[in-house]
């Protein structure tokens, strides 16, 4: 089985990093371009991003004849569509994937088919349905590490530390490795000694320098997440290194751009997001940077984003409450509306970035956030 990970459960730009463990996602020797003296990003020709994801996904669907469709072929096609959604940032291939599932009776579904449907639900923020499918996977294959890792990712994005700990324990069963180290130290970083947890993961990365390349890649992204949350100065370098390892990964690009915004480096955000205006999350971050810089092209991009958000709501595809709240707060300067969007986002997503957004929107709106701010170590939720 191909082992893959969906980092952080359901962030709109690709519910995170969908890394295929055992397959090399990085582009070795990718051409890079320097931005000023500090920022390095892949050159445009190092990134391959589909401009017509729906057409490609439709072709993939048409290539599967209903008669004689096997569970293995179905799982392979579903994985291709999920990857297409990840690469483009669009949910539309996921709708085609859902249609493919109807072409094989559920009585013939394998653990891998259930796993792919769980991933589809996860990307669409249908976390309860994803969990139900993961139950099916683990009933058929109790040791399926991909299912446990997906469960861990969903638990984190929902702020359910108890469930995340249980999933992480199963990832450690009988197998050491950087993925197990990553989840263990990431969870420890929410406790009383977060800096120690960060150092432990850093040491594990040093020890595992020659281990599975993609597991190492996963650990590096986790390290960057932890450094950002702990406000460590090396966070930017870690995001930069992570992005250079996989230039096509939209999640890393967005997290790096957001880190740059937090450092008041708006000009560099324009370079990191250049050419990715079709991806809502990156377009919003670009619009924030343009707003701060009073860029002459800001009104055009803002108008496009307003149209996209309106169309997405009309189509029933609105998955980007976090992005919409950021847009309202940092571009439109409408704290009250941003607070409503941040609260809607908090209903399903309770990762640290979601908490930070809700607290900031509430503060600027002069309203209580409604978040438990006890901050007790050993807590069961974020």
Predicted features and spans:
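N-terminal leader/linker segments that initiate helical-solenoid repeat arrays
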Residues: 29-112, 123, 132
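Residue-level recognition of tetratricopeptide repeat
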Residues: 79, 83-86, 119, 153, ...
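Residue-level detector of the short coil/turn that links helix A to helix B
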Residues: 92, 125, 159, 192, ...
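Generic helix N-cap/helix-start motif at coil->alpha-helix transitions
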Residues: 70-77, 108-114, 140-148, 175-183, ...
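Alpha-helical adaptor scaffolds
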Residues: 115, 119, 216-217, 291, ...
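Solenoid-like repeat scaffolds
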Residues: 65-68, 102-107, 135-142, 169-177, ...
């Amino acid at each position: 089985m191909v082992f893959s990970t969906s980092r952080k459960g359901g962030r709109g730009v690709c519910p995170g990093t969908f890394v295929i463990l055992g397959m090399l996602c990085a582009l070795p020797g990718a051409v890079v371009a320097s931005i000023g003296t500090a920022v390095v990003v892949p050159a445009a020709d190092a990134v391959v991003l589909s401009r017509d994801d729906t057409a490609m996904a439709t072709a993939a669907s048409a290539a599967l004849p209903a008669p004689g469709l096997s569970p293995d072929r179905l799982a392979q096609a579903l994985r291709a569509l999920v990857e297409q959604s990840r690469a483009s940032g669009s949910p539309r291939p996921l709708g085609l994937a859902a249609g493919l599932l109807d072409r094989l009776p559920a009585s013939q579904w394998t653990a891998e088919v259930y796993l792919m449907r769980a991933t589809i639900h996860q990307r669409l923020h249908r976390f309860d349905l994803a969990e139900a499918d993961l139950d099916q996977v683990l009933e058929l294959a109790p040791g399926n590490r991909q299912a446990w890792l997906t469960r861990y990712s969903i638990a984190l994005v929902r702020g359910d530390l108890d469930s995340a700990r249980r999933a992480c324990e199963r990832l450690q069963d009988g197998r050491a490795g950087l993925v197990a180290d990553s989840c263990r130290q990431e969870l420890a970083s929410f406790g009383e000694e977060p800096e120690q947890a960060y150092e432990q993961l850093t040491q594990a990365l040093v020890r595992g320098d020659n281990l599975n390349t993609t597991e190492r890649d996963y650990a590096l992204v986790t390290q960057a997440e932890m450094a950002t949350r702990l406000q460590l100065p090396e966070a930017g370098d870690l995001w930069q290194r992570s992005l250079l390892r996989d230039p096509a990964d939209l999640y890393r690009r967005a997290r790096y751009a957001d880190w740059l915004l937090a450092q008041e480096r708006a000009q560099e955000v324009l370079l990191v997001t250049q050419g990715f205006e079709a991806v809502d999350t990156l377009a919003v971050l670009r619009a924030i940077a343009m707003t701060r810089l009073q860029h002459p092209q800001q009104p055009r991009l803002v108008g496009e984003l307003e149209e996209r958000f309106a169309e997405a709501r009309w189509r029933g595809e609105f998955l980007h409450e976090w992005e919409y709240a950021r847009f309202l707060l940092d571009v439109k300067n409408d704290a009250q509306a941003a607070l409503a969007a941040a609260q809607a986002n908090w209903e399903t997503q309770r990762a640290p970035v979601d908490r930070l957004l809700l607290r900031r929107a509430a503060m600027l709106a002069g309203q209580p956030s409604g978040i438990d701010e006890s901050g007790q170590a050993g807590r069961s939720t974020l």
